[in-house]
């Protein structure tokens, strides 16, 4: 998504002898905009054999999905949680359902203006809302260590998205 911008930056820093790139995910190949003579992966982080993540699976019929999500979120008793949906419309539907049932949550997706997204994150971080309902936009770049729960209301469409979503905890 940022190939043009990264190509420009790469050209501007051609004079540098060493370039260090950091990524949250491992890639098989370097992006096209990079032209390293001798690329190397240094100090690659490997996940521990015993990560501090517990996965739970709750099979639910589609017609009961909203109700079960509501029950699950209530069981978290105020701990910060993120609920991931695949589409903006789904985030709005989930948030509306929860609000209609007395549960306050806030949405975060790419269809919002930048200032709206920033306000949503501020309200989530400061505890005004304990649940953030978001698209995969929220799976990257959010660093909120207090997040205790990640819920996949809609299962991600790729393994990479699954990894990034769960990385929020």
Model regions and ranges:
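Loop/turn-to-beta-strand initiation segments
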Residues: 15-20, 79-80, 104, 127-131
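A short beta-strand element within the Helicase C-terminal
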Residues: 131, 140-155
């Amino acid at each position: 998504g940022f190939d043009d911008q990264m190509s420009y930056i790469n050209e501007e820093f051609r004079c540098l002898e060493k370039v260090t790139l950091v990524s949250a995910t491992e890639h098989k190949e370097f992006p096209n905009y990079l032209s390293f003579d001798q690329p190397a992966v240094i100090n690659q982080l490997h996940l521990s054999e015993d990560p501090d993540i517990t996965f739970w699976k709750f099979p639910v019929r589609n017609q009961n999905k909203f109700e079960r999500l509501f029950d699950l979120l209530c069981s978290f008793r105020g701990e910060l949680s993120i609920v991931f949906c695949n589409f903006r419309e789904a985030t709005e539907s989930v948030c509306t359902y929860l609000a209609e049932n007395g549960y306050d949550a806030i949405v975060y997706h790419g269809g919002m203006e930048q200032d709206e997204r920033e306000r949503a994150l501020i309200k989530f971080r400061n505890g005004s809302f304990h649940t953030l309902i978001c698209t995969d936009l929220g799976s990257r770049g959010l660093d909120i260590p207090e997040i205790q729960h990640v819920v996949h209301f809609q299962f991600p469409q790729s393994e990479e998205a699954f990894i990034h979503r769960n990385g929020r905890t």
